[in-house]
Swiss-Prot record:
Residues noted as binding Mg(2+) 1 in the record, renumbered to the chain: N90, D106, D110
Record's protein name: Nucleoside triphosphate/diphosphate phosphatase
Binding site for Mg(2+) 2: D108, D110, D123, E126
Recorded family membership: Belongs to the Ntdp family.
GO function term, MF aspect, one: magnesium ion binding
Amino acid sequence: MVRESIPKEGENIKIQSYKHDGKIHRVWSETTILKGTDHVVIGGNDHTLVTESDGRTWITREPAIVYFHSEYWFNVICMFREDGIYYYCNLSSPFVCDEEALKYIDYDLDIKVYPNGKYHLLDEDEYEQHMNQMNYPHDIDIILRRNVDILQQWIEQKKGPFAPDFIKVWNERYKKIRQY
């Protein structure tokens, strides 16, 4: 049995995304922990190797801050690009950590947020298809739809990872940790 463990500041961990059927979806090879508690994990990565379920690999193009919360069914990736900060929000199970990686189940729905604050809900067709193929329980559908609403409120209210201070503080912390 693998024990649960909270990653420590400065530690490098893997992030593993699964699908509802238990199959691996995507793996980020290295993320540096900036904050790790029972409820929140914040990390940073840059030019990180990502492996897809079919074995294909690619490398992230820009620095990013990642945000995971144990009570919400989403995670947020804040990407620093030349024309501004973009957010990619995955509707997912709350995270768990063990000695191997930080892990979550990806539930297909995503929200992309642009530097001007506009956002779009993505992959609704994929969600419907996988909900039928993998028999997502009705309760999960209700939880995910409720969390889409929560996430949209956070975006509009600039709350949590969407707050300008959040980005500034955690990006600076990531830069400092990378220097050592």
